[in-house]
Structure formats: structure tokens, C-alpha cells
Amino acid sequence: MGKPGGAKTRTAVCLSDGVFFLAGAFMSLTLVWSYFSIFSPSFTSLRHDGKPVQCSGLDMQFDPSEPGFYDDPDLSYSIEKPITKWDEKRNQWFESHPSFKPGSENRIVMVTGSQSSPCKNPIGDHLLLRCFKNKVDYARIHGHDIFYSNSLLHPKMNSYWAKLPVVKAAMLAHPEAEWIWWVDSDAIFTDMEFKPPLHRYRQHNLVVHGWPNIIYEKQSWTALNAGVFLIRNCQWSMDLIDTWKSMGPVSPDYKKWGPIQRSIFKDKLFPESDDQTALIYLLYKHKELYYPKIYLEAEYYLQGYWIGVFGDFANVTERYLEMEREDDTLRRRHAEKVSERYGAFREERFLKGEFGGRGSRRRAFITHFTGCQPCSGDHNPSYDGDTCWNEMIRALNFADNQVMRVYGYVHSDLSKTSPLQPLPFDYPNEAW
């Protein structure tokens, strides 16, 4: 039988050893924690009120109480009143809202719009709704905010001039965005993976689809298309808008600008001054001032005239399916939130160095149904019957296939919007 005293001695020794072990472990953890506190980077920054802000997200509930440019009663959103020192104002806003700084150089707000009244064309409202859905889909996939305007912001700035007041107001409402991306209501994203190469435009403040030689050699009003453009949120752009609108209906000299434009650009169709010809006029007459800062993009369809695009939907679909048959990475199911990863993979694996345009392996980025007038229905008389509406539906379904595939469905027939066809696993290797 063991002695009671001997058992007590062994227990005391074990407890003593345990205390020393725990003390040593605690000291080790304290040293490790201290080391990382000194040498590890901090992932927080200070707000204007001194409170920390996590850099992992935008702090959309914080706005300092100190007065900023928004509190200036002289600041006007109106197209009639110029904005000054906008770069300084934006910088001050970022200083007081530091969580918005990371990634701001590539931040985009998409802006679009349509008329405020119902469409005369029986199918018009449906087409505009679907065109808006198309833009919302693209914006959601790529993390862009989007603003839709269906009201005139100035009673005189209507029709094609209505975009300028909206763009200016969006610039003021979104100082966190580096780019405002205007997209006409009848322009449809037909490549949901492609992203504008913003790095290419680092030295430019306006990006528009166009060709320099057609401006300076042929003097054509179709040298660029002002229905889709990226404009940098900066003072230069504010000044451009102020000059640009001076040829519009808000100007007392509006009536004289139509004849002046037509005297230079002989093929101009409209007798009155329009926004597109006005921009070309500025480039033509003041090349040294505007051309260095305006990027005329022609390497891909920033906007592609629909007549040159719609007949290729079947061929381009097959070309993209061939890429997916060749590499199973593109057939892999994935969450919509990581779709950009697969678009980047396709770009690097199959499309690097491939220019856009007719005959290209690329899908047209944006297909613009210029002249179709889906709301009024008064399309260009050279277009046959319902060709405009039928091809808009096909283009929308072509784009929707790229969206709905992530949800497990596609349109098997581009002319039919509903119902959709469920996709088999490993499509297109596994046929329907």
C-alpha cells in the first residue's frame, strides 16, 4: 500500500511543473504578440474624426461634420454654371473619406437614361427595360455603380444633348469615381467579360470610339460616336462639358452652330447643332487643346454599329465554344462574383493581342443600335420593317446567355427570350 504522504509529494511536483510550463508558454506568446505588433503592417487608417477605418471596405456610414464643398451654396449642379477647382475639391473629399482611396483610380460609375414618358412604339418600353437590364448585368459583374436618369435635368437640353447635364451631375455626386461611363439607352453590351483597358488611358481624360483620319482628312460627322464614352472625373472634363454645351440649346448662339458645323462636315444629316458634331468640331478646330487628352479608340468595339455586328452572333458563339472545348478551365462552374477571373483567363489564353472589329475572334464589346429609335419607333427608313427590334432582341439574348450561363441556363434560340434551356454539366463538352 502506498504511503499517503508520498502521493501528496508527487502531486505537488506535477503542479509545480505545470505552473512553470504555463508561465513559459504565456511568456512565449507575449513575445510573439509583441513582435508582430511592432513589425506587422497595420490594416487600418484613420478617419477624419480620428477613428480607425478598416481598409478592407468602404465606410459608407461616415461623413465628417466639418463643412466641405457640398456645403458651399454657390456650388451648382446646373449645366449652366461652371465648376472650378474640382480636382482640389475631390482631393479634399478623399482626405476626409480615406476608405474610398484604395482602388479609386479604376472606379467607374455607369450612367444611362431615357425619356420620361411612355414609348410610342408598342415594343419600345420592353426593349428599353431589357437594355437597362443588360447594363445592370454588366455593372454588377464588374463591380460598377450605375445611375439611370429618365428626366431632363435642364428643360432646353433635350434629345441627344440631355446626357451632358446628367454626366456633370454624376461627376459631382460621385467624387469617389475616377470615370463616368455614359452609355446610350440603345447601346447593348454584347461581351460581358471584356473590360476597357483603363491603363491605356492614363494620360487621357475622354475615351470615345473614333478615327483621327476621318476627322482631320475627311471631315465627317461620323468620325466618332458620342453615344458611348468614358470621361475622367476631373477639372479638365468639367471645362470640356462647359465648352461642349455652349454649342447646345442652352446657349444663346445655338442656332448659329448648326450651319457652322455643316459648313465643315458636309455629310452631317441634321440641320441643328448636335452633341456628336460639336465634339468633332472641338477636335477639328482646337486640335492642340483637345486631341492630346481625347483617346479615339478603334482597336475594339467601344461601340459597334449594329449593321456590321448582328450577322456574326452565331459564328462568334461557336468560336467561344471552341475555346471552352479546348480548355476545361472555361467550362468550370463558378460563382458570378468571380466571373472576372475566367474572363481574364480567356483573354490571356486565347485573345491576347487580338484586335476587335469585324472578322475578329472577339465578340463586339458594345453593339449600338444607332438609327433604330426603339422608343419612338421612327427608325431609319433604310432599315427593313421590324429588323431593328428583332435584332435588338437577338443581341440582348446573345448577351444574356453570357450572364445566365453562370445561373445554369441559356437561350437555345436567340430569337426567343423565354423559356431558357438548362445546361448539362461540363457544357459544351457535354452536348444538350
From Swiss-Prot:
GO terms for molecular function: galactosyltransferase activity. Its main location: Golgi. InterPro entries: Glyco_trans_34, Nucleotide-diphossugar_trans. It holds the Pfam family Glyco_transf_34. Keywords: Glycoprotein, Glycosyltransferase, Golgi apparatus, Membrane, Signal-anchor, Transferase, Transmembrane, Transmembrane helix. Probable glycosyltransferase that may be involved in the biosynthesis of xyloglucan. This is Glycosyltransferase 6. It comes from Arabidopsis thaliana (Mouse-ear cress).
